[in-house]
Each structure stands twice: as C-alpha cells, then as structure tokens.
C-alpha cells in the first residue's frame, strides 16, 4: 500500500534544544527516525522543519525536507503546511512520526497506515497495554479508552476507566497490590490520517477539552469524528524529551 510519512522536527525544544541534531551513534537523531520510516515501506518520507541546520542535515543523508513556519501551535498545523506545499492529494494516507522517536519500530509505522485503510476512518492510531501501576497513575502517560470495536471513546492523562471498587478498597498506600485489568491502555503518539482530513482539522478551533488535557487529538472527538485504535505489534522504546532520555537511547544504539 502507498503512504507518506511526515516527520515534524522542531529545533527549539524547551527541554532539549537542538535535539533533532543530537548525535546518536555517529548520526543526528533525525537521521535515525528517517531511516526507521524508510524501513517501514513508506512510499515517501518527508522531514518538516523550521530550522535551516536541520534541513541541511537531512539533505546531507539524501532525505527529502520541507521548510515550514516557526509559528505553528501544533505538529498537526505543521503537517497541514507540508501537505499544502507539496500538493498532496486529499486521499493520500499520511503517517505522522515524531522527530524524537529514533527507536520507533518500522512495523508499527506500516501498521498504523493499514489500520486507517482497513477501518475507513479519517484518523487512526495505536496503543499498548499498561501493566505497571506507576505508569497507570503517571499524568505524562496518556491513557486511551475504546469501545468494543476499537473506536476511541476518550483520551486522558487521568486513569480511565476508574476502577471504583478496587481503588476505594486499597487506598493510596496499597496501590502496588492493584490488579490491572485488560482495559488499561497507553496511547502511542503515532497517527495516520487522510491528507484532506488534516486540512479539515486545522480549520477547527481549539476545544475546551484539548486545552484542559493538553491533548490535541481530543479536537477530533469533539467535532464528532471517529479514531480507530489497534494494539501495536511492537511496543516502541523510549522517545527523547530530556537529556536523560537521550543518554538512554545512546546507550541502546551503541550496542546495536
């Protein structure tokens, strides 16, 4: 199947400035992400950046790059600009991979594109089971709840669903004894969309729920669209948000 991967790569990260160019095993981080996207079988891979040094690095390893505005409020707005500039057809499948995911498994890149095509929705994504109590209660871990057919009911940083009886009985001191049931899933931040839908998305105003949770995908649900979720065939390793994350990834890739 045909699909295009777009990799937004912002240089001005608040927690780790310049991270697309951070050296990992002799290559800039953005090159590792690009290579994983290439291995997925994508028809086309484009790096979207607002910084000339990142663009120069991408051209240096023969990657395709699209320069974008530095004024975007979200990664989705950056995607919309790329789609407009490259005149991508409305029915083209677009997979969005974050530029700080150098360990993303290529198999899940193709999986999310197939998920979109199979279920005939405008947006699809992936999740993995939560099996750790600390992860469940961590607000930096986004939880996703679906119906019986895998369509999203809600995304939240809070624990959903709330297991009233078990949580009340155990209390905070005994959370380690929780029996995590099969409905707890961690959302993986990889998306597939139709190009035309991305253009529609950026026409919608930000919504109350997305501003409260700081989760822009809630804008899709707010406007009545469906998102389909599948369990990822392979759980992705750590992304790079901090210096500590970067060192972990360097350690992993130094042994490959």
From Swiss-Prot:
Activates KDO (a required 8-carbon sugar) for incorporation into bacterial lipopolysaccharide in Gram-negative bacteria. CDD domains: CMP-KDO-Synthetase (cd02517). Its main location: cytoplasm. HAMAP family: KdsB. PANTHER family: 3-DEOXY-MANNO-OCTULOSONATE CYTIDYLYLTRANSFERASE, 3-DEOXY-MANNO-OCTULOSONATE CYTIDYLYLTRANSFERASE, MITOCHONDRIAL. GO terms for biological process: CMP-keto-3-deoxy-D-manno-octulosonic acid biosynthetic process; lipopolysaccharide biosynthetic process. The gene is kdsB. It is an enzyme of class 2 (transferase). It catalyses: 3-deoxy-alpha-D-manno-oct-2-ulosonate + CTP = CMP-3-deoxy-beta-D-manno-octulosonate + diphosphate. Belongs to the KdsB family. It holds the Pfam family CTP_transf_3. Keywords: Cytoplasm, Lipopolysaccharide biosynthesis, Nucleotidyltransferase, Transferase. One of its GO terms (molecular function) is 3-deoxy-manno-octulosonate cytidylyltransferase activity. Pathway: Nucleotide-sugar biosynthesis; CMP-3-deoxy-D-manno-octulosonate biosynthesis; CMP-3-deoxy-D-manno-octulosonate from 3-deoxy-D-manno-octulosonate and CTP: step 1/1; Bacterial outer membrane biogenesis; lipopolysaccharide biosynthesis. Coiled coil: none annotated. It is found in: Cytoplasm. Its EC number is 2.7.7.38. This is 3-deoxy-manno-octulosonate cytidylyltransferase. One of its GO terms (cellular component) is cytosol.
């Amino acid at each position: 199947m045909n699909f295009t991967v777009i990799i937004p790569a912002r240089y001005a990260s608040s927690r780790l400035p310049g991270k697309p160019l951070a050296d990992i095993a002799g290559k800039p981080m953005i090159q590792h992400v690009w290579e994983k996207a290439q291995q997925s079988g994508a028809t086309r891979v484009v790096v979207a950046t607002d910084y000339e040094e990142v663009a120069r690095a991408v051209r240096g390893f023969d990657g395709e790059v699209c320069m974008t505005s530095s004024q975007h409020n979200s990664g989705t707005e950056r995607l919309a600009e790329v789609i407009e500039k490259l005149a991508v057809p409305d029915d083209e499948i677009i997979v969005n991979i974050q530029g700080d995911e150098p360990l993303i498994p290529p198999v899940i890149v193709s999986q999310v594109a197939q998920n979109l095509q199979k279920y005939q929705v405008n947006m699809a994504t992936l999740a993995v089971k939560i099996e750790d109590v600390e992860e469940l209660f961590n607000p930096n871990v986004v939880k996703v709840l679906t119906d019986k057919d895998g369509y999203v009911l809600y995304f939240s940083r809070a624990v959903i669903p709330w297991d009233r009886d078990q949580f009340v009985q155990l209390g905070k001191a005994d959370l380690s004894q929780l029996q995590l049931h099969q409905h707890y899933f961690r959302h993986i931040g990889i998306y597939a969309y139709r190009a035309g839908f991305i253009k529609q998305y950026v026409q919608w105003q930000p919504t109350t729920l997305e501003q409260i949770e700081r989760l822009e995908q809630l804008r899709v649900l707010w406007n009545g669209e469906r998102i389909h979720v599948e369990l990822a065939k392979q759980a992705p390793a750590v992304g790079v948000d901090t210096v500590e994350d970067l060192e972990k990834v360097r350690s992993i890739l130094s042994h490959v």
